Amino acid sequence: MSNYDVIIIGAGPGGIFAAYELAEKAPELKVAVFEAGNPLEKRKCPIDGKKIKSCVNCKTCAIMSGFGGAGAFSDGKYNITNNFGGTLYEYIGKETAIDLMNYVDEINVKFGGEGTKMYSTSGTHIKKLCMQNKLNLLDASVRHLGTDINYVVLENLYAKLKDTVEFRFNCHVDDVEAVDGGYRVITKDGVDECKKCIVSVGRSGSKWMENVCKDLKIPTKSNRVDL
């Protein structure tokens, strides 16, 4: 059994940026990230369109899980808005929420996103056209990294973190239990304890997280899904 100051469950954007902030602001802390999937460079879906044309139900899906989360192979769009994409502002206020989104954008630019464009719907011809037709186009600023740059940013963030944060890949967490002074995190490899536990398992882990919250008597609510 190992003891940590902080265990982060999930190496998607939430887990990565939590680890980054801890490494920057409190480097003396012992931090670990437990991720069910593979490191970024080992995330390979076996579907090739030739020999394998459909899902073979891998034990851990390389598209959904692994360093970078489900968006690792996306076109890297980061939305800066309170109008959709979650309700963080309900907990910390709209201004602070936007400030934090801009902070994430600064980190993405710093780690490889220089030269990528920021787009906005505000004041555009499309916005005016929507208003004329009684449609409400939600305002947002959008950083478009692109698939290749998004991958580079993730590579650079991992290179920054790997020497100060312990990453455990292919490490599926079965349960989280409250104990005196912290939490016990149970995996197939054993039991580890920590003072603080950050759970950031994304959409694919939402049902598991709901059960953990129920066991720990943490209230939850359903969030809308943006399409």
Task: Give, region by region, the residue ranges found by the protein language model.
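Residues forming the flavin
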Residues: 2-85, 122-227
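Dinucleotide-binding Rossmann-like beta1-alpha1 core, especially the glycine-rich loop
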Residues: 66-116
